[in-house]
A protein has these predicted regions:
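Cleavable N-terminal export/targeting peptides
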Residues: 1-27
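Short loop/turn motifs that connect adjacent beta-strands in outer-membrane beta-barrel proteins
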Residues: 20-29, 43-44, 59-69, 94-100, ...
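Transmembrane beta-strand segments that form the barrel wall of outer-membrane beta-barrel proteins
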Residues: 30-40, 66-78, 101-110, 142-147
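Outer-membrane beta-barrel architecture
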Residues: 35, 52-54, 88-90, 128, ...
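Gram-negative outer-membrane beta-barrel proteins
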Residues: 40-44, 59-61, 79-83, 108-114, ...
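Outer-membrane beta-barrel "beta-signal"
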Residues: 47-53, 156-165
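Residue-level signature of outer-membrane beta-barrel architecture
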Residues: 55-57, 91-93, 131, 145, ...
Length: 165
C-alpha cells in the first residue's frame, strides 16, 4: 500500500514540473472558467446540480512532447453540499474555432449530504469541447469522472457533465 501512495505522490509532484518542457512567459494572462452542470448524472438517487469555477494561468503554459500543457486549479459545490477542490493539468488542442481539452486533476472531496465517494483524495479526469466566440470568450461542454482509484474501501465514482463559460 505504501508503494501505491509513493507513486501517486511522485506523479502529482513530477507531472507539472519543469522536466516536461520549457515555461512560456507572456503578459498577465489568466482564464476564469465558470460552469454549471449535473454531478453524478448516471446515479438517479445521488445526482445533483453543481456550480463551479476553474482558473488557468496562461503564463505557465508549457510546450512539451505531450503538446501545450497548462496548470489548472478549481472547485465545485453541489446542491447537496458536497465539495471538491483540485489542482492539475490540462492539454489544449487548437482546432481552429474549437478547442479539445482533456485534463487530469487530483483533489480533495467532502461529501456533505451528497454521495460518499469512499475517500477524501479523488482524481478528476475530464474532456471538454469549446467554441471560441471572441478572443476572450469560449462556450464549452465537458464531461468528467471523479474517482479515488481504489484508495478507499469503496470506489463508486461519479460521472458529471457541465456547461462552461
Amino acid at each position: 500500500m505504501k508503494v501505491k501512495y509513493f507513486f501517486l505522490t511522485l506523479l502529482i509532484f513530477i507531472l507539472p514540473s519543469n522536466l516536461l518542457g520549457e515555461t512560456k512567459v507572456e503578459n498577465e494572462n489568466h482564464q476564469m472558467n465558470l460552469f454549471v452542470g449535473n454531478f453524478d448524472f448516471s446515479d438517479d438517487k445521488q445526482k445533483a446540480t453543481l456550480l463551479g469555477f476553474q482558473h488557468q494561468d496562461e503564463n505557465l503554459n508549457r510546450n512539451t512532447f505531450l503538446g501545450n500543457v497548462s496548470p489548472i486549479t478549481g472547485g465545485f459545490v453541489t446542491e447537496n453540499s458536497a465539495a471538491y477542490v483540485y489542482t492539475g493539468v490540462e492539454w489544449n488542442v487548437d482546432m481552429g474555432s474549437f478547442y479539445f481539452t482533456p485534463s487530469f486533476a487530483p483533489g480533495l472531496y467532502h461529501e456533505g449530504d451528497g454521495k460518499d465517494l469512499g475517500h477524501v483524495l479523488e482524481f478528476k479526469s475530464e474532456v471538454q469541447l469549446s467554441y471560441k466566440t471572441t478572443d476572450t470568450t469560449n462556450f464549452a461542454v465537458s464531461y468528467n469522472h471523479v474517482s479515488n482509484a481504489s484508495l478507499g474501501d469503496k470506489n463508486p465514482g461519479a460521472n458529471s457533465y457541465m456547461f462552461n463559460f
